[in-house]
Amino acid sequence: MKVKFAHQLRAIAALSVVIYHYWGIFFSPAVRTIIGVPASFAPAKPGYAQHVMSPGQGGLIYGVFGVGVFFLISGFVIPISLRNISTGTFLVRRFFRIYPVYWFCLLISLSMYFICSWYWHTPLSDRTSLKYLLQTLPLLHSVTGMASLDFVCWSLAVEVKFYVIFALIFLAGRNAHKMLALSIGFLTLCCAAAYLAQHDSSPESMLSLLTSDMKFITFMFLGCLFYYALYDELTVAAALGYGAIIYVLFLMTAASYEGSIGGPLARNYTYALVLFSACYVLRDRFRDNRVLDFLADISFPLYLLHSTVGYVLMAILIDHGVAFTFAWVISLGVVLLVAFGVHKYVEIPVNAFGKKVSNLAGRPPKPVQRDALPLEGSP
């Protein structure tokens, strides 16, 4: 059974996030201030980028939509990753798949802060402090309410929490129905906790910080249902039934933060769910595509690097008289090149090493379908 559709959706998700950041967030004075660009720098936004931050009622917010697709892909492939290995082996492989690449890319992002400060003669951002870095390295910064150094690793922190939660539930029962019953029970408690956190606690309370990511994690469980249906562990009718319950829990949890059912996050994640569902139904029609497959292969380092590298390069290029369109195209080209290098010389070797380490720690895994292997990357 093919899973190529999910792998190629990584490319669509990554491009959606890049467009959102380059055509939208880049023009935010607050973001430019964080990286060290002076307030006097105020680039003009071209007409084709105007809709990105002002999509209108019900409009598509590229970045939110793209992250939603990433979360569904993760929910879909994590059960595949656990299919033939122990929970311990899974967690070891997840560590090596995520953290070394993340740390390497974080160093590149950190260097961009120094380059920006040197070029513009501005003070270094507080995000370059040792304290900030130490809290960001383990991807636990969201628990303390700290923003991401690279603007994007907050979603990676969500995924790490999901991996741990899913692995613990998986230990309790591998049967699909038992897994989902336990998951729904857990998500229901989280939904109630999120409501209490938003209505009876301060935004900075520990309960609020601990439950802030549950709207994302609940949504990720929807991706698991596609796996169970694909591998015939659930009938389509059963998957739809469980999906309806989890989707309602997602809407209710998101509403605790957005103030109403169907806010921008819930709406755009629903768009992501519609796209993923359509691609799942049409999965047999997906074929090799050099562009999509390449972007999907490097999507993890591309996602981690595009914001800080792009923001700094675009500002410098525009300051030298380069038009915005050429500036973002050149910056994207540089980011693609660097991401490819990280993928080839860091991500692939480290993943291979992680598999060797996990095999030494436990029983060697049974063979997994070849077409499922590329999907193990993150985000």
Feature locations, PLM:
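Hydrophobic alpha-helical membrane-insertion segments
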Residues: 12-26, 99-117, 302
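Alpha-helical transmembrane segments in multi-pass integral membrane proteins
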Residues: 2-5, 19-41, 45-61, 80-84, ...
